[in-house]
């Protein structure tokens, strides 16, 4: 039910170049293709939403709400996002364990305790969804 595209697994503001146009702004460049593969483009929401959740939860909500309003989402969107958030959480957790001996904010935090808020984040949008059955 999705159009395969390039999924970066690290799509976030810091890896994009945005250009002003007459119609507003558009992404004109992307960096960091090291983990890129073909897949479901929705997978790239997880890294940016996760970053916003850590830095500014209100911005995460605004980003997610705007995405849902602007893009017709397919049935199963919430469940897929939970899996994508789990996968991204595993990647981030593994990186920090290997390179710093734990998460910068708290090296004693267990994975489940740290990852659960990210994995469950999309639950709040279950009743606000605009479904596209196509």
Language model regions located:
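A structural signal for well-ordered alpha-helical scaffolds and beta->alpha junctions
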Residues: 4, 56-64, 74, 108-115
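Glycine-rich, phosphate-binding/catalytic loops in enzymes
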Residues: 23-25, 46-48, 109-110
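Active-site activation/catalytic loop segments of kinase-like enzymes and analogous catalytic loops
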Residues: 42-73, 85-103
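Alpha-helical scaffolds flanking conserved acidic
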Residues: 77-84
């Amino acid at each position: 039910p999705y159009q395969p595209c390039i999924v970066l697994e690290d799509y976030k503001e810091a890896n994009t170049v945005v250009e002003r146009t007459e119609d507003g702004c558009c992404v004109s460049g992307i960096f960091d293709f090291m983990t890129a593969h073909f897949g479901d483009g929705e997978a790239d929401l997880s890294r940016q939403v996760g970053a916003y959740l850590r830095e500014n939860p209100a911005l995460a909500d605004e980003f997610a709400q705007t995405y849902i309003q602007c893009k017709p989402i397919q049935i199963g969107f919430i469940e897929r996002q939970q899996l994508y958030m789990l996968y991204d959480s595993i990647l981030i957790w593994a990186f920090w364990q290997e390179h710093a001996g734990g998460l910068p904010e708290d090296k004693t935090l267990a994975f489940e305790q740290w990852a659960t808020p990210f994995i469950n984040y999309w639950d709040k949008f279950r009743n606000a969804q605009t479904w596209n059955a196509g």
